[in-house]
Amino acid sequence: MITKKNFSLKNHNSFKIDVKAKEFIEINSKEELIKLNELLKNEKILFLGGGSNILFTKDYDGTVIHLNIKGINIEKENSDFSVVKANTGENWSDFIEFCLDNNLGGVENLSLIPGNVGSAPVQNIGAYGVELKDVFLSCEVFNTDDFSIKNFDLSDCKFEYRNSIFKKRK
């Protein structure tokens, strides 16, 4: 876990707007994420992935949590399907490239969508007739109410066109 005060977010948003966060915490593991409970009670928090779906107009007077948990691996593979696990901090295009490099088809229409893997379920990203829900099995979700990690399967996510349960919750 890396913590910085009065931190520029210029390199953490696609518009490259040079605003500052009162505090910036980079999370590099699931264990660090769970430890946030001890650090952030009653704090104003913004979770930030790749910064491609946010427009900062002024400094952020709170704590920005940058989820930088990396890792992509093939969990299961047979002649019918494959299961690939990708962590929240992975760049979406890098994830697609990993799949294509390993001859795992079905996701190629989703290439070059900006952002990180962790934000893909929020928007139910899609392009050229394919949506995330078409190739999605499950995701681990960090619950900010009790600082626990829960598993959401396809039906739990309530995917709709460019929408999911993650947009509808507080």
Language-model segments: what does each one mean?
Residues 1-131, 135, 139, 143-145:
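Anion-binding (especially nucleotide phosphate/pyrophosphate-binding) glycine-rich loop
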Residues 142, 149-170:
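Long, positively charged amphipathic alpha-helical accessory segments at protein N-termini or as interdomain linkers
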